UniProtKB/Swiss-Prot annotation:
High-level lineage: Bacteria, Bacillati, Bacillota, Bacilli, Bacillales
Matches recorded under Pfam families: PAS_9, STAS
Modified residue annotations for S-4a-FMN cysteine: 62
Keyword Oxidoreductase attributed: no
Keyword Transport: no
Knockout consequences: Cells lacking this gene have a twofold decreased response to salt and ethanol stress, and a somewhat reduced response to energy stress, indicating that PhoT is a positive regulator of sigma-B activity. It acts independently of both RsbRA and RsbRB (YkoB).
Post-translational modification: FMN binds covalently to cysteine after exposure to blue light and this bond is spontaneously broken in the dark.
Name the record gives this protein: Blue-light photoreceptor
UniProt keywords, alphabetically: Chromophore, Flavoprotein, FMN, Photoreceptor protein, Receptor, Sensory transduction, Transcription, Transcription regulation
């Protein structure tokens, strides 16, 4: 079996090996000239990261780190890069000796030594980073949900107060939320209160009409409240014709007029 010694770096080999054993990432070198592209060098960082001993690693293909949730698409990306002798970077779920999953940011680069190709793989455990990303994603999802509160008023009537700015992203979130809720609640009316909107522009007006069309498809009628004088002036400047919609000064007035289901 080929080994790290075969690279022939006289006088510097031990220094290089000690240096690699002190870095905080896993380092492996594989030899594609041998059957199944086995690992011919592994540093202590890889040993500590995976829990496997050096003798359990040398001579094996790196696929022994794969498991139940390893993404086949990323494995294919690695395989293609190796076949083409190209560098590749992936973030992939791997497994330690004890079965613990960890996120591995894997960088593989081809290395030429005396007309012979090797592959150098650098592994960085980014599990904590992925956990933080998931927490952030969950927090943003919760914030989005809180910014789209569908409030049941009484049987057949719900209200959606809009506060702040109605961005494209938030509008899409509202559409998704309304589609899910109204498909089960079967409300006859949805009151959207605009009094809390910080800004009204052509996009806002267009979004309101899109919501009206969407609600008609679900059998729910849109009611608009909170169009204050200054808001009405802005709407007029934008040529937004709300005459096709039922509008009231506030939610309370709308509820008084709407029939009891």
């Amino acid at each position: 079996m080929a080994s790290f010694q075969s690279f022939g770096i006289p006088g510097q080999l031990e220094v290089i090996k000690k240096a690699l054993d002190h870095v905080r990432v896993g380092v492996v070198i594989t030899d594609p000239a041998l059957e199944d592209n086995p690992i011919v060098y592994v540093n202590q960082g890889f040993v500590q990261m995976t829990g496997y001993e050096t003798e359990e690693i040398l001579g094996k293909n790196c696929r022994f780190l794969q498991g139940k949730h390893t993404d086949p698409a990323e494995v294919d990306n690695i395989r293609t890069a190796l076949q083409n002798k190209e560098p590749v970077t992936v973030q992939i779920q791997n497994y330690k000796k004890d079965g613990t999953m960890f996120w591995n940011e894997l960088n593989i680069d081809p290395m030429e030594i005396e007309d012979k190709t090797y592959f150098v793989g650098i592994q960085n455990d980014i599990t904590k980073q992925k956990e933080y990303e998931k927490l952030l994603e969950d927090s943003l999802t919760e914030i989005t949900a809180l910014s789209t509160p569908i409030v049941p008023i009484r049987n057949g009537i719900s209200a959606l107060p809009l506060v702040g700015n109605l961005t494209e992203e938030r509008f899409n979130s509202i559409v998704c939320t309304l589609t899910n809720i109204l498909s089960t609640s079967k409300d006859d009316y949805l009151i959207i209160d605009l009094s809390g909107l910080a800004q009204v522009n052509e996009q806002t007006a267009d979004q309101i009409f899109k919501l009206s069309h969407l609600l008609k498809l679900t059998g729910t009628e849109l009611i608009i409240t909170g169009i204050k004088p200054e808001l009405a002036m802005k709407m007029n400047k934008l040529d937004a014709n709300f005459s096709s919609l039922k509008t009231y000064s506030n939610v309370k007035d709308a509820v008084k007029v709407l029939p009891i289901m």
